[in-house]
Regions:
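Gly/Pro-enriched, hydrophobic low-complexity segments
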Residues: 1, 64-160
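An acidic-aromatic
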Residues: 1-37
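Feature targets compositionally biased, intrinsically disordered low-complexity regions
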Residues: 8, 18-19, 42, 51, ...
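Residues at the C-termini of beta-strands that transition into short coil/loop
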Residues: 16, 59, 146
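A broad, low-specificity signal for short, low-complexity segments enriched in glycine/proline
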Residues: 17-19, 28-35, 42-46, 85-91, ...
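Short acidic/polar alpha-helix capping motifs at helix-coil junctions
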Residues: 20-22, 44-46, 74-79
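Short, solvent-exposed mixed-charge patches
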Residues: 163-164
């Protein structure tokens, strides 16, 4: 089974077979907003000023035995990311996100690891995340990554209804 989550520049949509859904569904505004931030491939720190964010260094904090550098990033939309950087390579190893979803404050934690260099860019091949404090999180492991590969924009469009 394959889960699909897409955004075409205007609206988000998904197919969630693990939740028993086989047909594409349009996302709520909050879900699409969350998807946009999660899809920001360069992360919250690259070009943070141009993105309208502010960044504050908060010192170091232990992340699973690593004394990580902790940064507080306040996004243009008011969301807050706490970004934890590995002290040796300055790669993101954890991001804690605080945002409003459906009128309630939520906090999610994402751990990144198993970095590999692809065309001069480091990609995390392991991403594990979910609500902060929950032990059963969703884990994504990548087999392959390409940098700057050509992609047909139509693959992001909401699928047409199947003909009957």
């Amino acid at each position: 089974m394959t889960q699909i989550v897409a955004y075409d520049g205007t609206e988000g949509w998904k197919i969630s077979p693990f939740g028993g859904r086989k047909d594409p569904e349009k996302m709520s505004i909050d879900d699409a907003k969350s998807l946009l931030e999660d899809a920001e491939i360069d992360g919250p720190l690259i070009n943070w000023k141009e993105k309208g964010s502010t960044v504050e260094y908060l010192g170091t904090e232990d992340v699973d035995g690593t004394p990580a550098h902790k940064l507080r990033v306040v996004r243009k939309n008011g969301d807050i990311n706490y970004v934890f950087l590995d002290p040796d390579h300055f790669l993101e190893i954890r991001i804690v996100t605080q945002r409003m979803e459906n009128g309630a404050q939520v906090e999610n934690e994402t751990d990144l690891g198993d970095y590999e260099k692809i065309n001069g860019v480091y990609f995390p091949f392991s991403i594990e995340g979910g609500p902060k404090g929950v032990t059963d999180k969703q884990k994504i492991v990548f087999d392959k990554a390409d940098a700057n590969a050509p992609i047909d924009d139509t693959m992001f469009k909401f699928p047409a209804a199947p003909s009957k």
